[in-house]
């Protein structure tokens, strides 16, 4: 109820000055914030575009800044949605975790999947995107951490247009790992200005645990 009231109060305040709002909350697959925003928007009779990112963290920030840039360019709401939606639909996040128990406890991964991974000593490469409906799922399973890292890099390089894709390497207190991935991508030709390193937000890090690396990527043409 506290979250509902905070969103309600914010929307009431925004309604005084704006006729259209873009909201970029945590994906529907991990949170009810988006549906709460839609419900409040209907109640207050507001024109709110709630964007489902099918993701978290850096991609939310990227799209919010992108929308602001398009607004400053005097794009209409329809034009903005037409520009950003294909990029969102094709965006992806790969997740490499040290310990699956955090995801299991938080209900983000089934106990069976976590137990099987531990028993077989495998390293799952997780992903979250439109195809997973914004939920964390297993993309592949390999035998060593080094192979998991290599698989993630190869998968991303196969997916992207290196000149027009932004790669966000986010981590939970594992800067050394993030720097390693950045070096790998630059060596493969990704422009350094298209690679960004940041922390995983705390609301997500409590589920992933320390030492996690997530690599998020989205296409944006100038």
Enumerate the language-model features and the residues they cover.
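Glycine-rich phosphate-binding loop signature in dinucleotide/nucleotide-binding domains
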Residues: 13-21
């Amino acid at each position: 109820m506290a979250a509902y009231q905070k969103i309600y109060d914010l929307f009431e305040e925004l309604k005084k000055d704006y006729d259209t709002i873009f909201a970029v909350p945590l994906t529907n697959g991990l949170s009810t914030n988006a549906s709460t925003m839609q419900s409040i928007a209907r109640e207050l009779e507001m024109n709110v575009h709630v964007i489902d990112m099918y993701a978290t963290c850096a991609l939310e920030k990227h799209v919010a800044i992108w929308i602001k840039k398009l607004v400053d360019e005097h794009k209409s709401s329809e034009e903005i949605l037409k520009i950003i939606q294909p990029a969102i639909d094709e965006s992806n996040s790969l997740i490499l975790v040290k310990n699956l128990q955090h995801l299991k406890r938080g209900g983000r991964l089934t106990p069976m999947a976590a137990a099987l991974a531990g028993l077989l000593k495998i390293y799952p490469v997780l992903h979250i995107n439109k195809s997973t409906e914004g939920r964390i799922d297993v993309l592949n399973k390999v035998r060593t951490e080094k192979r998991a890292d290599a698989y993630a890099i190869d998968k991303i390089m196969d997916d992207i247009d290196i000149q027009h894709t932004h790669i966000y390497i986010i981590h939970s207190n594992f800067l050394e790992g993030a720097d390693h991935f950045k070096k790998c991508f630059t060596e493969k030709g990704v422009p350094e200005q298209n690679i960004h390193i940041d922390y995983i937000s705390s609301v997500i890090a409590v589920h992933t645990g320390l030492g996690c690396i997530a690599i998020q990527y989205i296409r944006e043409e100038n």
